[in-house]
UniProtKB/Swiss-Prot annotation:
Free-text function comment from the UniProt entry: Contactins mediate cell surface interactions during nervous system development. Participates in oligodendrocytes generation by acting as a ligand of NOTCH1. Its association with NOTCH1 promotes NOTCH1 activation through the released notch intracellular domain (NICD) and subsequent translocation to the nucleus. May be involved in motor coordination.
Phosphotyrosine: modified positions: Y882
Protein known as: Contactin-6
Species per Swiss-Prot/TrEMBL record: Rattus norvegicus
Location of the Fibronectin type-III domain: 600-698, 703-800, 805-901, 902-996
Family note: Belongs to the immunoglobulin superfamily. Contactin family.
GO biological-process terms attached to the record: cell adhesion; Notch signaling pathway; positive regulation of Notch signaling pathway
Length: 1028
């Protein structure tokens, strides 16, 4: 009966909550702030801001000093939106603490406390101030005595009529706490009138006090005395977090005291500390916990020192560490909220509901920032505030508690309409209706109630779980939810699919670099389901869409084979084929081992090096899955072409050998070494080169070759040889040893040539007869000693130039462009000079200054044809003998005139006729110009079309017959013959083979005319000339 009454009471509330589910609580956008209002300001209104969001829009109330403001009773206060406007503010009525309250159907929130104060400063009294008399050297304090005020003040002093304020220094100080002016030691220049100026920043007003006269006494000068501290800071100062703290300390004394500061706990002053010019003010900006402690001011001079000290105590208003959050609970549930705030001193906590203090009772308990409400009912809904307060400030954390009571409802969270599972799989169908309190759940399959079994389970959250699903489990399932407020139900269908199976998985493979392989991945699956294949390599997805090099997916819908083309060492690893459907994810993995040539050996070092050997060590590189079988050592020098393999000890370096001796090196040569490894797959990349090292020096062991010489001047022996390459010089200080003696002599003469690049030595001696034979040997040496000598060669000494000129010189022109020069050979002997050949000189007038050229012939040749001459031109020629010493005297010059130029016009109007194997040709006689040679005859040049060999027929007539087998096309051209040479040729004529002609014809060619003519019984064909 009691439960029934509860339901009767709750039903209206439940209906109301259903309509309010879309309401949102008020949240402050803008809260009132502390205001110090200047009384003298002409503005006649104060605005305390307050704005809140929420749906529906909140309405506002205000409290002053804890009492609601009744806006209906006065026009002095009015609402401007949510803000409070105070017209014609008055100190006696309006000063105090204000709070804004924002309310909508969800609840009420209370704003922070805002303090309203009024800033002012009254005028100084107008009565005169007493004169202050001091001795020179004495300290003095001039009192300001500010008038009644409220708000922060600042102080300045002026001296006499000077508009500038008195500047502070070590001797003078204006306290911003008391406003007094302190002069540590009075000087004669200080005498005069002093005026105090006071400014109230909040009140926007400054006032000026009456002047204070300062006069100097005449009864002597003040002697020295120890400092007397007149400005002290309090013994205890409360300093807020992040505030700027200023401590003042100033002393009178003679001499003027020095001010210094320190911390009594011995810790250094914070780096952020600032000092005034006079050191009388210590400022600590952004005050923090670590800045609190005891501070001491020390004032000292020659007469002594004095101290002032005080304690800075850190305080901080509350700051939230943990706030409460909006909470939605079911009726009869329990609420637990906790809020935490930091602060110094530690804050205390108060709880409010809808702006009013929350009273504790049996269900509602509060303790140290926690709130517990048991057996919640709908009336507990509202806006709650946790207030954290210490003596410096109060802060609020706000949250909504919404207590829900409703019958089960599936409208927002129905059962999934279609659930799909595979045979043998497990399926969970969720049932999560909105129900307050929580509903009891039952299930139906079709129209029958479902019971739990070994495969069917009802989970705690109401879900239905079916294990090891069979095809018979398919069908419609309904979830029925019930609580004391009613019931609800929701249905869905279960569809059972066949399982997916990987029928051909990838398998382990062992492959060689450069091969192409296919990793299979084939499945059987339910035909109604799509299958997605994804391949992974060492855990990373292979993105085939981006066209990754080497990888390609091949196969059809049920085949996900992966082809790897030109496989590389980096492709060794694990390959995972995943098969995904909407219901499951299968995978199969295979290891691929890629074998390749070894990687480069590492850490190649030269342990020792001699003149011809080097000891090397190295570490093997990766074997790339195939054991290393052999190492090879290669060297490179500045003289070699690339890297060369070298001989080693041991001769064969197997895969377990990591050091060897290189032999056969050249002394005094810079070498680099590298090591190459090989295995069954091939030869790998070489190692990095070793450091560049030079073999030790040694005596040169290679003698020069091609020992030769001869020539030169009379009384000279010229010896030549092929220089020794730098890589065979074996050390520094390299040079050549020249040994020679006359044939028949037993004594060798010896000379040294120190130039490395030398390949020639000249020995001079007036006693040497021309063409005297010498035995010659050439050797080598360096700083290590003398090396090998070459074999003996015979070299002749220098000779004289020929002394005789050729006789019987003649010249004859054969054409327009060449001539032939003839002479008689010289019968020479040792006294007349050896003749190695002759030199022909030719020119165009009787002076050799117009020399055109010279041509040499060797041996006993006595004629020379000279070509490339100008036509119809007189040429002169002479001949002289030469040998290794030079040329002899020239023969007397002879001359000849070259022939005129050959005809420039080619034969024209060429006609031909062909009968059997006989070709008849006719053409017009060529007429020459005056400067051209007369036509002596004609040349017919003919060849088969596909052959390059040309046949020539000469005739003095303007016709010719050719007897040739015309089995193929012939190409024919005709040119003139004259004393000046052959003239211009006609255009090339193509004579077609017999089989291509229907009868016999005549071809007639003119530059611009083509015509057809009958000759006897033959046809005439006009054929275009071929392009040359």
């Amino acid at each position: 009966m009691r439960l029934l009454w509860k339901l009767v009471i709750l039903l209206p509330l439940i209906n109301s909550c259903a309509g309010e589910s879309r309401f949102t609580r008020p949240i402050f956008i803008q809260e009132p702030q502390d205001v110090i209002f200047p009384l003298d300001l002409s503005r006649s209104e104060i605005i305390l801001s307050c704005t809140a969001s929420g749906y529906p829009s909140p309405h506002y109330r205000w409290k002053q000093n804890g009492t609601d403001i009744d806006f209906s009773m006065t026009y002095h206060y009015r609402l401007d939106g949510g803000s409070l406007a105070i017209s014609s503010p008055r100190t006696d009525q309006d000063i105090g603490i204000y709070q804004c309250l924002a309310t909508n159907p969800v609840g009420t929130i209370l704003s922070r406390k805002a303090k309203l104060q009024f800033a002012y400063i009254e005028d100084f009294e107008t009565k005169s101030r007493s004169t202050v008399s001091v001795r020179e050297g004495q300290g003095v304090v001039l009192l300001c005595g500010p008038p009644p005020h409220f708000g922060e003040l600042s102080y300045d002093w002026t001296f006499n009529d000077n508009p500038l304020y008195v500047q502070e220094d070590k001797r003078r100080f204006v306290s911003q706490n008391t406003g007094n002016l302190y002069i540590a030691k009075v000087e004669p220049s200080d005498v005069g009138n002093y005026t105090c100026f006071v400014t109230n920043k909040e009140a926007h007003r400054s006032v000026q006090g009456p002047p204070t006269p300062l006069v100097q006494r005449t009864d002597g000068v003040m002697g020295e005395y120890e400092p007397k501290i007149e400005v002290r800071f309090p013994e205890t100062i409360q300093a807020a977090k992040d505030s700027s703290v200023k401590l003042e300390c100033f002393a009178l004394g003679n001499p003027v005291p020095d001010i210094s500061w320190r911390r009594l706990d011995g810790s250094p002053m914070p780096g952020k500390v600032k000092y005034s010019n006079s050191q009388a003010t210590l400022e600590i900006p952004k005050f923090q916990q670590e800045d609190e402690g005891f501070y001491e001011c020390v004032a000292g001079n020659l007469r002594g020192r004095n101290l002032a000290k005080g304690q800075l105590i850190f305080y901080a208003p509350p700051e939230w560490e943990q706030k409460i959050q909006n909470t939605y609970l079911s009726i009869y549930d329990s609420l637990f909220w906790e809020c935490k705030a930091s602060g110094n001193p530690n804050p205390s906590y108060t709880w409010l509901k809808n702006g009013e203090r929350l009273n504790t009772e049996e269900r509602i308990q509060t303790e140290n920032g926690t709130l517990i409400i048991t057996m919640l009912n709908v009336s507990d809904s509202g806006i709650y505030q946790c207030a954290a307060e210490n003596k410096y400030q109060t802060i609020y954390a706000n949250a909504e508690l919404r207590v829900l009571a409703s019958a089960p409802d599936f409208s927002k969270n129905p059962i999934k309409k279609i659930s799909v599972v595979q045979v043998g799989g497990d399926i969970s169908i969720e049932c999560k209706p909105n129900a307050f309190p929580k509903a009891s759940i039952s299930w139906k399959r079709g129209t029958e109630n479902l019971k739990q079994s070994k495969r069917v389970f009802f989970l705690e959250d109401g879900s239905l779980k079916i294990c090891n699903v069979t095809r018979s489990d398919a069908g419609s399932y309904t979830c029925v939810a019930t609580n004391q407020f009613g019931n609800g139900k929701s249905s869905g269908s279960l569809i059972v699919k066949e399982r997916t199976v990987i029928t051909v998985p990838p398998s382990k493979m062992d492959v060689t670099v450069g091969e192409s392989i296919v990793l299979p991945c084939q499945v059987s699956h339910d035909p109604t389901m799509e299958v997605l294949f994804v391949w992974y390599f060492n855990g990373d997805v292979i993105d085939l869409k981006k066209g990754v090099a080497h990888f390609e997916r091949i196969g059809g819908e049920s085949v996900g084979d992966l082809m790897i083309r030109n496989i590389q060492l980096g492709h060794s690893g694990k390959y995972l084929c995943t098969v995904q459907t909407t219901l499951e994810r299968l995978s199969a993995v295979a290891d691929i081992i890629v074998r390749g040539p070894p990687g480069p050996p590492e850490d190649v070092k030269v342990e020792h090096i001699s003149s011809t050997t080097s000891q090397l060590s190295w570490r093997p590189g990766p074997d790339n899955n195939s054991p290393i079988q052999i190492f090879t050592i290669q060297t490179r020098t500045p003289f070699s072409v690339g890297w060369q393999a070298v001989a080693t000890v041991p001769e064969i370096l197997n895969g377990q050998t990591y050091n060897a001796t290189v032999i056969g090196l050249s002394p005094w040569v810079e070498y680099e070494f590298r090591v190459v490894a090989g295995n069954n797959i091939g030869i790998g990349e070489p190692s990095k080169p070793s450091e560049l090292l030079r073999t030790k020096a040694s005596i040169p062991n290679v003698a020069p070759v091609n020992i030769n010489g001869g020539g030169g001047s009379r009384s000279e022996l010229v010896i030549t040889w092929e220089p020794i390459p730098e890589e065979l010089q074996n050390g520094e200080g390299f040079g050549y040893i020249i040994m020679f003696r006359p044939v028949g002599s037993t004594t060798w003469m010896k000379e040294k040539v120190a130039l490395v690049e030398s390949s020639k030595f000249i020995y001079r001696n007036e006693s040497i007869m021309p063409l005297s034979p010498f035995e010659v040997k050439v050797g080598v040496y360096n700083n290590e000693g003398e090396g090998s000598l070459s074999t003996v060669s015979i070299v002749y000494s220098g000779e004289d130039e020929p002394r005789l000129a050729p006789r019987g010189t003649s010249v004859q022109s054969f054409s327009a462009s060449d001539m032939e020069v003839s002479w008689n050979a010289i019968a020479w002997n040792r006294n007349t000079g050896r003749v190695l050949g002759y030199e022909v000189l030719y020119w165009t007038d009787n002076s050799k200054e117009s020399m055109i050229g010279k041509i040499r012939v060797s041996g006993n040749v006595t004629t020379k044809n000279i070509t490339g001459l100008r036509a119809n031109t007189i040429y002169f020629a002479s001949v002289r003998a030469y040998n290794t010493a030079g040329t002899g005297p020239s023969s007397p010059p002879v001359n000849v005139t070259t022939k005129k130029s050959p005809p420039s016009q080619p034969p024209a109007n060429i006609a031909w006729k062909l009968s059997n194997s006989k070709l008849c040709l006719n053409w017009e006689h060529v007429k020459t110009m005056e400067n051209e040679s007369e036509v002596l005859g004609y040349k017919i040049l003919y060849r088969q079309n596909r052959q390059s060999k040309t046949h020539v027929l000469e005739t003095n007539n303007t016709s010719a017959e050719l007897l040739v087998p015309f089995e193929e096309d012939y190409l024919i051209e005709i040119r003139t013959v004259s004393d000046g040479g052959d003239g211009s040729s006609s255009e090339e004529i193509r004579i077609p083979k017999m089989s291509s002609l229907s009868s016999v014809g005549v071809q007639i060619l003119k530059p611009s005319t083509q015509f057809l003519t009958m000759v006897g019984f033959f046809y005439c064909f006009v054929i275009q000339p071929l392009s040359r």
